[in-house]
Every structure is written in structure tokens, then in C-alpha cells.
Amino acid sequence: MSKRWSILLVFTVALMAALFHFLPGQAITTGSWGLSFQKEGYAPKGPATTDELSALDAAYLGDTTQKKIYLTFDSGYENGCTAKILDVLKEHNVPATFFLVGNYIERNPELVKRMVEEGHIVGNHTMHHYDMSKYSDPKTFAKELTDLEDLYREVTGQELAKYYRPPQGIYSQQNLKMAQDMGYKTLFWSLAYVDWNTNAQPTKEAAFQKLLPRTHNGAVILLHSTSTTNAEILDELLTQWKSQGYTFATLDNLFA
């Protein structure tokens, strides 16, 4: 090998090493968020580690040394359940975060105002609930979030909290970086179940079987506010979590 090619090879290897060293979360790829539970009562593993996510101001899990739960709801539309959910949260004095889309805010301004008045956080689930991993242009990506910010401001007179949840849990490293550049913190989850299909709602017993054994320290719990089952079981669910020694914290605490 000539001296010239040797120098070129060394330079190329060094450049690639530098790129991999300085790109935050470089192991994160495009995908759909999923979980692998190893043992009941313990935090699951996600497609990316907490360190990889943290480099991009993202998380799926809180402090696993503390018996805290972070309760979140995704709200794509109203199915007659949110008022009851809010009633139960108020009765138990439990804070939650509601990730809303544009259609929800437009059609349910009074419920959105109630969320705010009762001390809950409202987060950004994008204007149209598109697959955001297909958006490589920062301006196009940003518009999905800023349009929702504008709508929320019109309805509540307040600024939207800078928490983002990717629609359908589909994400890419580029998306997470674009959200970070906009000042957002991205939140996935460490516990969920199939509650979103309104045509095939799980029974109360099935829901408890999925949720309670898998609850863990620092759990970020995703429920859908469209679920009639969730509205039915929430009171008992919160009671059981409290009896197990869990307390409920806000995302401000998680990202502190």
C-alpha cells in the first residue's frame, strides 16, 4: 500500500471514529417504541438505553430507586371518558400529563381548560398525529409541533409545556434531535397495554393483569383516554398503586 493511501485510510478511520463519538444517541435508529419485560415488578428494557435517550433530552423511565409513578394519557379524540378520568384524578389528588393532538383541542376546548385548571400538564402529540419519522426537513417537523402550540395558546391563553410524545411511538434519532433543538423533551413510556382499540376493549380483569404485576419504580405509564376500561378501572387502579407504596410525580420531576 502506498504512503498516500495509508495516510488516507488513517484519516478516514479517524474521521469515522470522531463522528460516532460526537453524535449523541448514535445507536438510536428509526423504529417503533417497544418494551421487553425481564421480570415482574422491574423496569423493562427499551429499544434505546436511558443514556442514549438522555443525550437527546428524551426518556422512558424515571428514577428506579424511588417508588414514583408518572401517569400519562394520550388523547387522539374524545370518546366520552375524559371527564370521568379527570374526576378520579381530582378525587385522588393525582397529577397526570395529557398528550393532545390538534383535533382534540379544537373539539374539546372545555376539557383542555379543565386539565389546565386542575393542575395537569398538557404535552405535544403533534397537530395531525402523523408518522413523524418520515419528516426529515426540520421546518416541516417543527410545524407539526408549533401549530399545536398556537392552537393551545388560543384556547387556554397559556404556553404549551415542552414535552413531546411521538405519534404511535414511531421515532428516529433525527426526530429526537429536531425536537431537542426546539427545546422539547421527548417522553416514551415503560408500561402500557392494548387499551386503544375501542372496538375490542379489555376486561377489567385483563387490564389489571397486564398493569399491576408490571408496575415498577419510576414507571412512565401510558394509558389512552379513549378507553372505557381505563375510565372504569382508574379509581381502583390508583387505590391499588397507592396501597403498594407508590406516589405520583410530574414530568418536571422526571426531567429535573
Predicted regions and their residues:
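Intrinsically disordered, low-complexity sequence elements enriched in Ser/Thr/Gly/Pro
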Residues: 1-2, 163
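Catalytic grooves of carbohydrate-active enzymes
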Residues: 216-252
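Enrichment for repetitive, rod-forming helical segments
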Residues: 10-11, 132, 172, 231
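Metal-dependent polysaccharide deacetylase catalytic core of the NodB/CE4 family, i.e.
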Residues: 67-69, 79-81, 90-222, 226
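N-terminal pre-catalytic segment of deacetylase/amide-hydrolase enzymes
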Residues: 2-72, 78-87, 91, 206, ...
